[in-house]
Amino acid sequence: MCSQELWLENERKCAMVRKSKPSRKRQELLAIAFGVKVGLKGGFLWSPLKLFACSQISSLVRRAALTHNDNHFNYEKTHNFKVHTFRGPHWCEYCANFMWGLIAQGVRCSDCGLNVHKQCSKHVPNDCQPDLKRIKKVYCCDLTTLVKAHNTQRPMVVDICIREIEARGLKSEGLYRVSGFTEHIEDVKMAFDRDGEKADISANIYPDINIITGALKLYFRDLPIPIITYDTYSKFIEAAKISNADERLEAVHEVLMLLPPAHYETLRYLMIHLKKVTMNEKDNLMNAENLGIVFGPTLMRPPEDSTLTTLHDMRYQKLIVQILIENEDVLF
């Protein structure tokens, strides 16, 4: 064997040694962490130890990503736990204890995949970071879930649609009041569900701007929890009933502070946009009152599904949206 071949063979052996040392070190560190021995007599423990470590790694990686990602928008989100039957051995990612049983051993978050005991789920903090692989669609998806999954301030549908409307539609007569073709609006919805932020809603595909406004309104209507949440609905209605304008404005501002951060940011962005719409009233014939009529029932829904309540509250819904538009620079 020539000297060059001997040198290459020696380097290969050295590389194998260097590779094995960190592996051995990792075994020792894991063993210390879990309180077991991995010497000559304890080597047989390495396989179950590795299995246990792997069962914990997804949780560790997820929490590390949350800690170190500076661009992450700090919106709190509760976990969406559902009873789950696990195949094979699983450990609780909260208490690190084994999940006993053959069926329904614990619960799994359907948004991020966190696995915990049912009793432990009551103590898990609101730190759900949804996994994009688990988000099947954009429409009908919880707003906070969507923005956390995509790590954005607002839902992509809102950003993309408003950007398109402001680029070519602010002077369109009856903007938001005139409806586009329903089947074309459904096409836009399917495009967002299928392609996400890559959805093409340009004038080349949808020349009628009313299709884009219709798709935006449909997104808000399809939210499982409205922009103005069920928890704050009655408080907004009560604020709208206050006769004194200054006191009413103050009351509305106080209730706004109760909205979840993602809802607040989306509502703020929408109101800034609608204010721009009213600034083109001479062309589009849409003032704050007209937009309030359109967006009141779209952004606000009573907690109880009552037609009578909805009809009774319509004027207050309109007034709330009108106030938000006219005073967006003060309220937000």
From Swiss-Prot:
Q: Where is the protein localized?
A: Membrane
Chain's role:
GTPase-activating protein for p21-rac.
What is the activity-regulation note?
Answer: In the inactive state, the N terminus protrudes into the active site of the Rho-GAP domain, sterically blocking Rac binding. Phospholipid binding to the Phorbol-ester/DAG-type zinc-finger/C1 domain triggers the cooperative dissociation of these interactions, allowing the N-terminus to move out of the active site and thereby activating the enzyme.
Site description Arginine finger, residues in chain: R177
Name of the protein? Beta-chimaerin
What would be one Pfam family of this protein?
RhoGAP
One biological process GO term for this chain? signal transduction
Where does the record place the Rho-GAP domain? 141-332
Record's GO cellular component terms: membrane; synapse
Q: Which stretches are zinc fingers (Phorbol-ester/DAG-type)?
A: 78-128
Gene that produces this protein: Chn2
Give the InterPro entries listed for this entry.
Answer: C1-like_sf, DAG/PE-bd, PE/DAG-bd, Rho-type_GAP, Rho_GTPase_activation_prot, RhoGAP_chimaerin, RhoGAP_dom
Q: Which CDD domains match?
A: RhoGAP_chimaerin (cd04372)
GO terms assigned for molecular function:
GTPase activator activity; zinc ion binding
- Report membrane topology: Peripheral membrane protein
What are the UniProt keywords, alphabetically?
Answer: GTPase activation, Membrane, Metal-binding, Zinc, Zinc-finger
